[in-house]
Swiss-Prot record:
Source organism of this protein record: Oryza sativa subsp. japonica
Hydrolase as UniProt keyword: yes
Tissue specificity: Ubiquitous.
Taxonomic lineage: Eukaryota, Viridiplantae, Streptophyta, Embryophyta, Tracheophyta
Annotated binding of substrate, by residue: 80, 195, 274, 357, 364
Catalytic-site annotation from UniProt: 196 (proton donor), 314 (nucleophile)
Protein name from the UniProt record: Mannan endo-1,4-beta-mannosidase 4
Length: 461
């Protein structure tokens, strides 16, 4: 009998756990590896890795970044697997690729693997930085198609074919350094369809929803082993169970947090956190209140309506002197975010990790690094307090790795019953439905475990 006999069968399209293959999979609200043991993520953003690694003279900077990250316990890097058009393209025109840039991405993956760091690779951008959806629409226009808005990216047949070709090209790429196809490399944790998808042409979220419903299964058809996420910031829409009153400024961004993450081929949920930008001009207390409401709402919604893991894939606090921000305020924000992640993770909740924006190196050591400063950068070698906060959090999460996901599910269920039970007496709206959904989710999880055990120990014998 296999020692992995109790690994749960995932829902349709969810990435399955293959014993010993090192691929990250999902088990309820937890990420798991190998024999269904939990893994939590303390991560960073470094969008610039591929661009830097494309220049052999600068590859040392990429190696140093991974080395510093690993030394502080970080085990996840989120970075770009795209550069659409422009001066440093990965894809210079539809279907035409820059081999030098691709070899830079090869190096990033190989170096991450060497340092034990997983990669969350993003496939395009909502914004025009490094091309994104605007460049795809321009390419279609240059080919004679009458498109009038960047948001035509989500509906144009020709544009969608361009993007699907990019997906297939990246996922089937064979790394020139390791000889492993991207789609088979366990170093890659997951594919992110787009960085921060928004659609002002359709505030209801229907256009983005339809696009995700088409693209997420397409990714799975090319690569059925890796996880997929849309890349949402967490903004709510007009759909069912959407807490739209929590959106910054109370407006719609053309996405539905709950509905879009319910797409069959989506494996986990994401949110971003930038209270000082989203609530421009607000006080520190107002931002802290927003942060608590935002995270609590998404944790509860994810547990109740999605039953999948949740990551804060970007969080940041700027240090612009013009608005009086300083490192003490930034470090307080780091404490808030990381404490919330650990509180959820330690109780078996769905919020199981995050990635700060952004990791940079000392510009005096690495030429050109100062040009990447955006006010959010964290340079571990020069900010000892931030480095200490991040390192301690990494150690806390690492201590939680390797648990049985079913045990965490039962612990989380018990905790939620206690917390929600207290709120029921206050007439808390949807709390009864929330509780019932959580109980049902754990029942389904237990049923899958029993079914898997029967199949592997009796039917397959």
């Amino acid at each position: 009998m296999s020692s992995c006999a109790l690994v749960q069968r995932p829902p349709p399209w969810r990435a399955a756990v293959a014993p010993g293959d090192g691929m990250v999979a999902v088990d309820g609200t937890q990420f798991v590896v190998d024999c269904g043991r939990t893994i939590f993520f303390s991560g960073f953003n470094a969008y610039w890795l591929m661009m830097m690694a494309a220049d052999p003279a600068l590859r040392g900077a990429v190696a140093t970044a991974f080395q510093q990250a690993s030394a502080h316990g970080l085990n996840l890097a989120r970075t770009w697997a795209f550069s659409d058009g422009g001066d440093q393209p990965l894809q210079s025109s539809p279907g035409v690729y820059n081999e030098t840039m691709f070899q830079g991405l090869d190096f990033v993956i190989a170096e991450a693997r060497r340092h034990g760091i997983y990669l969350l690779l993003c496939l395009t951008n909502n914004f025009d930085n490094f091309g994104g959806k605007r460049q795809y629409v321009r390419w279609a226009g240059d080919a004679g198609h009458n498109l009038t808005s960047d948001d035509d990216f989500f509906t144009s047949t020709i544009v969608k074919s361009y993007f699907k070709n990019h997906v297939k090209t990246v996922l089937t790429r064979v790394n020139t350094l390791t000889g492993v196809a991207y789609k088979d490399d366990p170093t890659i944790f997951a594919w992110e369809l787009m960085n921060e998808p928004r659609c002002y042409a359709d505030p209801t979220g229907a256009m983005v929803q339809a696009w995700v419903e088409e693209m997420a299964p397409y990714v799975k058809s090319v690569d059925g082993r890796h996880l997929v996420t849309p890349g949402l910031e967490g903004f709510y829409g007009a759909g069912e169970h959407e807490s739209k009153e929590l959106n910054p400024w109370g407006i719609y961004y053309g996405t539905n947090y709950v509905a879009t993450h319910r797409t069959a081929a989506v494996d986990f949920a994401t949110i971003h956190l930038y209270p000082d930008v989203w609530l421009w001009g607000s006080s520190a207390d107002e931002q802290a209140t927003f942060f608590r409401n935002w995270t609590r709402s998404h944790i509860d919604a994810t547990a109740a309506y999605l039953g999948m893991p949740l990551l804060v894939t970007e969080y940041g606090k700027f240090l612009w002197k013009e608005v009086g921000a300083n490192k003490a305020q930034r470090n307080y924000f780091l404490d808030l975010v990381l404490d919330a992640i650990y509180a959820s993770a330690s109780r078996g909740g769905p919020l199981v990790g995050g990635a700060f924006w952004q990791l940079l190196l000392d510009g005096d050591i690495v030429a050109g690094m100062d040009s990447l400063r955006d006010g959010y950068e964290i340079i571990l070698a020069e900010d000892s307090r931030a480095a200490s906060i991040i390192g301690e959090h990494s150690e806390q999460l690492a201590a939680l790795n390797g648990q049985d996901a079913d045990v965490l599910c039962r612990r989380a269920s018990s905790h939620r019953r206690t917390r929600l039970g207290n709120s029921l007496s206050c007439g808390g709206g949807d709390t009864l439905e929330l509780l019932l959904r959580m109980v049902l989710a754990c029942f389904v999880s237990l049923s899958r475990s029993i079914s898997s055990f029967i199949v592997q120990n009796f039917i397959l014998l």
